[in-house]
C-alpha cells in the first residue's frame, strides 16, 4: 500500500502536432465564399442572400461589381443567350514583353476569353444584341479583340434589325496594344453611326468603373444612357484633373449621380430594375426594328 503511495505518477505526453490536429478537428469552420463584407458599409453579408438580391447590399444599397455570368443570369430569359465570336484570339501586335503570358494567366483565372462577351438573347421575350464588358479581365481594358467583337456584334444587329445594349466596365484603352487599342474607339463609334443611320436603338448601361477611352467613345454615344447607382464614370482620374486645374473637385465627382445631375446620362437604374427598364425601352422602339 505504502509502496503504491509513493510511486511515480505516469503522464501522457501530447505532442504539439497532436494539439494542432485536435484544434483543427474541433474548431468550427466556415466554407470559403459563404460570407462577404460590403466594401461600403462594412456589413457582413450571406453570399446566397447577396446573389438573390442581384449582388446588392440590402443595408446600404451598394452595388457589387459583377461579371458576365451574373449579367446574363439577371438580364436574359433563361437559356436564350447565345455567345458570338468567342474564338477570336488576342494577339501581341507590339511584342509587348510578358503580354502573352499575362493574357493566358488571366484566361485561366477568370475563365473568360476576353474583356467583352457578345451575343444575342431574349429579354421578356424580345430579342436584343448585347455586349457585356467584364472588369475582371485586365480591368475591362479595350484592345483589338474587344473592339472587333463589339463592332461585329453591331454589324450583326444591323443585319438582324435588332437593338444593341452595351454594358460598359473598363479602365480604358489597353496600353499593351498602343495605338491599335486607341483605334478601337473610332472603329466602334463608326459602327454605331451606321446603326444610328439604320434607325436602330442603342442603349448603353454604364457600370462601375467606366473610364478612359471607353468613356470617350461608345459609352457616351447611346440613344439612351443608363447607369447603375454610385458607379465611377469618367475619363481621366480625379487626382489627375485636380493637379491639372489646381482646384479641389466635389466628393461625388465622376459618380453616376453627379453625371445625372449635370445631364450626362438619362437615368440611374438599380440593378434589380434593369431587366424591366430595358424590356420597356425595347418594347417602345419595336416599330423601328
Curated annotation (Swiss-Prot):
InterPro entries: AcCoA_carboxyl_beta, Acetyl_CoA_COase_Trfase_b_su, ClpP/crotonase-like_dom_sf, COA_CT_N, Znf-ACC. NCBIfam families: accD. Acetyl-CoA carboxylase is a heterohexamer composed of biotin carboxyl carrier protein (AccB), biotin carboxylase (AccC) and two subunits each of ACCase subunit alpha (AccA) and ACCase subunit beta (AccD). It is an enzyme of class 2 (transferase). PANTHER family: ACETYL-COENZYME A CARBOXYLASE CARBOXYL TRANSFERASE SUBUNIT BETA, CHLOROPLASTIC (PTHR42995:SF5). Keywords: ATP-binding, Cytoplasm, Fatty acid biosynthesis, Fatty acid metabolism, Lipid biosynthesis, Lipid metabolism, Metal-binding, Nucleotide-binding, Transferase, Zinc, Zinc-finger. Component of the acetyl coenzyme A carboxylase (ACC) complex. Biotin carboxylase (BC) catalyzes the carboxylation of biotin on its carrier protein (BCCP) and then the CO(2) group is transferred by the transcarboxylase to acetyl-CoA to form malonyl-CoA. One of its GO terms (molecular function) is zinc ion binding. Its cofactor is Zn(2+). Belongs to the AccD/PCCB family. Disulfide bonds: none annotated. Pathway: Lipid metabolism; malonyl-CoA biosynthesis; malonyl-CoA from acetyl-CoA: step 1/1. It catalyses: N(6)-carboxybiotinyl-L-lysyl-[protein] + acetyl-CoA = N(6)-biotinyl-L-lysyl-[protein] + malonyl-CoA. The keyword Nucleotide-binding applies. This is Acetyl-coenzyme A carboxylase carboxyl transferase subunit beta. SUPFAM superfamilies: ClpP/crotonase. Binds 1 zinc ion per subunit. Zn(2+) binds at residues 38, 41, 57, 60. Its main location: cytoplasm. It is found in: Cytoplasm. Residues 34-289 form the CoA carboxyltransferase N-terminal domain.
